[in-house]
């Protein structure tokens, strides 16, 4: 009986410790990718007390001890330690971080943020070269977000793949859908209702690749405790939808005097129908 009690006590002591270590694995992985093959003696602890986002760190007996409100805060705390001690930089142009073999002891430093959410990206950011990022590039970007304290990124990848399913269910043909979509580099302006059918169509291969990529992106963001902002129906529709709903009034928009698009009023019942379908398709795919 005494042996069993000792075993049970040891088990109860070890399980929370193991769970705590597992809980901080996403932050530890970010840190390891940032420093490459180097080693840093660091302990990570999430203390999710209610209140503002915060991180704190100190070095005691050569060990860097970081506490934070979540995994993003832990990453932000590590990067603050790196920058404050002139050990390097992690940037879009590359990273150059050199961790000393032995860390000098350092007193406690704590930072509390007055804001709950730290937003990142805008609609236009998703144009230019960003549509062509693969998972390796996205992983670096999400690491950059975590190290800089971002916890609410805009996540628009695969928007068109989902909307294509909606247009198809409504009765549009593949050609009508293809004639609506702009090419990858121009998608932000299509999403804002400025243009359509420029440098398109988007292929099924493109849609499938974007869906697979978005699964990885959202999974990593959520592992770190981020709250990605996903798209919804904004009211812009293919011109061909007038064939299906001739009784509905659509507004024609013009941009730069040369480009035209069609918009559905949010007061129209069809707006709510399409909006509901989009959310259902998105949740079916991504949860």
Report residues per predicted region.
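Short N-terminal segments immediately surrounding and downstream of signal-peptide cleavage
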Residues: 22-37
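Short Gly/aromatic-enriched secondary-structure transition segments
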Residues: 80-81
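Bacterial Sec-dependent N-terminal signal peptides
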Residues: 1-23
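Glycine/proline-rich low-complexity spacer/linker segments in large multi-domain proteins
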Residues: 90-94
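Extracytoplasmic soluble-region selector
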Residues: 38-43
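Aromatic-lined carbohydrate-binding surfaces of glycoside hydrolases
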Residues: 34, 45-51, 60-72, 76, ...
